[in-house]
């Protein structure tokens, strides 16, 4: 008898790379569980452009590559795949027209409740659509995966009458294949390509307003006006776009492109994943100023690289942080500026070189331990 299957449909997340990385990370945890792998075969449905995210799993999963641009053909393909090929569960199922047909097989996932905690960052029609989608998931008796206690608290606050079976499952960032590909030659090439010859701190988020780059940019402006950290660059990656809040991007650009800030900021745009991790690996330290996260992938990346992180003081970060994280008020540029100076001074001390370089092998070993522990929560759903 053929094995039952768990379907991870990545076609719905094509416009959100973080959602695809999340699926990859959950699959990694599933593969650490003998209880899951002996009962189920994991199937990933993905488009050709993003298939390489999942090829690292080799023959441990079935990769179904499908273009998906023709919605009618995609619907027929999905129905055929689920009905005729033994799919028992659909992980992170979306309750769209097709997904609703398979609601009984759905494992739902809500990344966070940002539209409830920061509604001012959304357009009214997007708020309404998001609330309808989330409410439908909470009203069904299916398992609902949340990534943090903070998200669970938000669920209880905003949807107190929910009927879903809540499963709290953290995730690690499975980046070992990318890290193993980083060689001294690649590090040199990346430094040359992006002009990273000086010491730098790194901010790796896309420029959504809730990522709160503005506090970092204003902190850098304060430093430069005082002539501090003259030997440091500040490196940003991610698309400088937020369709919800274009005026926010204009505000950031106005500061970033003016002196004395402009000469110290490097806006690299969207970079390939291995290059991005190479940049993180060689940063003096990381800054993560976000106002909202479900369970932050940036922080999980930094943990695997064993990097020091200046981290916004929000509930989920208090839950997620490790001993190499220092919290700061995400609304106080002056406090962050002072912390940047203190951390840079410490990073420049020879006795702290190893601490700030990070121990990648230690981080990878810890990633495996945590993934195995998180797999227990997935077993509660599938086994």
Language model regions located:
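Carbohydrate transferase catalytic cores enriched for Leloir-type hexosyltransferases
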Residues: 1-383
């Amino acid at each position: 008898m053929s094995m039952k299957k768990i379907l991870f449909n990545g076609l719905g997340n094509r416009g959100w790379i973080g959602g695809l990385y999340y699926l990859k990370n959950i699959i990694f945890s599933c593969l650490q569980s003998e209880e899951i792998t002996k009962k189920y075969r994991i199937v990933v449905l993905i488009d050709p452009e993003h298939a390489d995210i999942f090829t690292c799993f080799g023959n441990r999963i079935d990769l179904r590559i499908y273009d998906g641009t023709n919605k009618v053909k995609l619907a027929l393909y999905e129905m055929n795949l689920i009905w005729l090929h033994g799919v028992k569960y659909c992980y992170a199922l979306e309750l769209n027209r097709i997904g609703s047909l398979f609601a009984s097989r759905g494992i739902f996932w809500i990344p966070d409740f940002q539209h409830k905690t920061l509604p001012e960052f959304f357009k009214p029609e997007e708020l309404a659509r998001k609330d309808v989608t989330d409410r439908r998931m909470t009203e069904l008796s299916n398992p609902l995966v949340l990534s943090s206690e903070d998200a669970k608290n938000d669920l209880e606050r905003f949807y107190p009458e929910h009927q879903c079976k809540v499963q709290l499952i953290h995730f690690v960032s499975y980046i070992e294949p990318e890290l193993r590909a980083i060689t001294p030659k690649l590090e040199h090439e990346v430094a040359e390509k992006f002009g990273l010859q000086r010491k730098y701190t790194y901010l790796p988020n896309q420029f959504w307003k809730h990522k709160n780059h503005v506090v970092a940019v204003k902190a850098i402006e304060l430093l430069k006006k005082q002539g501090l950290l003259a030997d440091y660059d500040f490196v940003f990656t991610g698309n400088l776009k937020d369709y919800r809040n274009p005026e926010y991007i204009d505000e950031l650009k106005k500061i970033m492109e003016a002196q004395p800030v402009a000469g110290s900021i490097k806006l690299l745009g969207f970079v390939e994943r291995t290059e991005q991790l190479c940049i993180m690996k060689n940063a003096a330290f990381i800054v993560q100023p976000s106002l909202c996260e479900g369970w932050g992938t940036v922080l999980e990346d930094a943990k695997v690289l064993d990097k020091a992180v200046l981290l916004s003081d929000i509930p989920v970060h208090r839950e997620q942080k490790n001993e190499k994280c220092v919290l700061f008020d995400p609304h106080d540029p002056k406090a962050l500026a002072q912390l940047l100076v203190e951390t840079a001074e410490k990073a420049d001390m020879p006795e702290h070189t190893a601490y700030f370089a990070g121990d990648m092998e230690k981080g990878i070993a810890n990633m495996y331990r945590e993934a195995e522990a998180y797999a227990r929560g997935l077993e509660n759903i599938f086994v």
